Each structure stands twice: as structure tokens, then as C-alpha cells.
Amino acid sequence: MLQDLNMWQVNLNRYLLSRHVRGGRSFPNLDCWGLVRDVYKSIGATLPEFVDFEQCTMHKAAKSCIAEHLFFEVYEPQDFDVIAFFRKNRLFHVGICYQNKILHTTQNRNCRYEPISNFLSHSDNICVRYYRCKLLYFHEKT
């Protein structure tokens, strides 16, 4: 049974101690999708390993998330929504939205919690999409 999200507090210090490892799926060695999976696991939802996500096109990622992994696209992010970054129609990064910021990990800076605008200011030609997990927000209408 899923934990009550209103009672759950993100332990940011725990994640900020993790280090970026390509393909990392176990704390403290996480890549960006590994971090998303670990956060969801801590709130009671199991996400797929999705090893090859870096090779996904926007269409494939959206189709996979919506159909297979019980996500749906949203335009106004809420806490625990997944934020996905695409460049030239290719998925290259994901993170977790929390309190209008992003929790994410990258190869050159490990894990951090910062305004989304900080990440976008260093990148050109990026498309951002937000996805909500139906397992966590089952009480809302889609």
C-alpha cells in the first residue's frame, strides 16, 4: 500500500550524498533515472529499471510512460512529478519535481536540489515535459 504523500518528507540530505554513476540503480550510486526510481520506491511505488532510457525518442518515452508505466503528461508540475528533458527529440535527463525545484543528478555535479531554471540556463534547445504517476495521484481526475 502506498504511503500517504502528505506525511512524507523528502530526505534531501540523503540524496545529496549520492554520487552519479551511469546506469546506477542502487543508493548511493545513482544516475538520473536511478534517482527517480529511488525516490518513488521511498514513497511506495516501484518503477521499471528502464535501462536504455537515454536512447528514447520523445514519442517512445511518452508512449512508454503513459501506456506501460502508468504516467500521464501534465502541464503544471506538482510534488513528485517526473520532469523529462529532451533535446532534438531525444530524452537526455530526468528528475523529480519537489516544492517548485528539481532533485536530479548529473555526471559532472552529482546530486543536487535547485530551481529548474538553473538547469535550463546552461542548456540550449531543450523541450521540458512533466509526467505524473497514477499510482501516487489516484485520487485526482486525469
Map each language-model feature to its residues.
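N-terminal capping segments
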Residues: 1-72, 86, 92, 134-141
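Charged, low-complexity, helix/coiled-coil-prone segments
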Residues: 23-26, 84, 112-118
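Aromatic- and glycine-rich peptidoglycan recognition patches
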Residues: 71-72, 91-142
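Loop/turn positions that initiate beta-strands
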Residues: 79-82
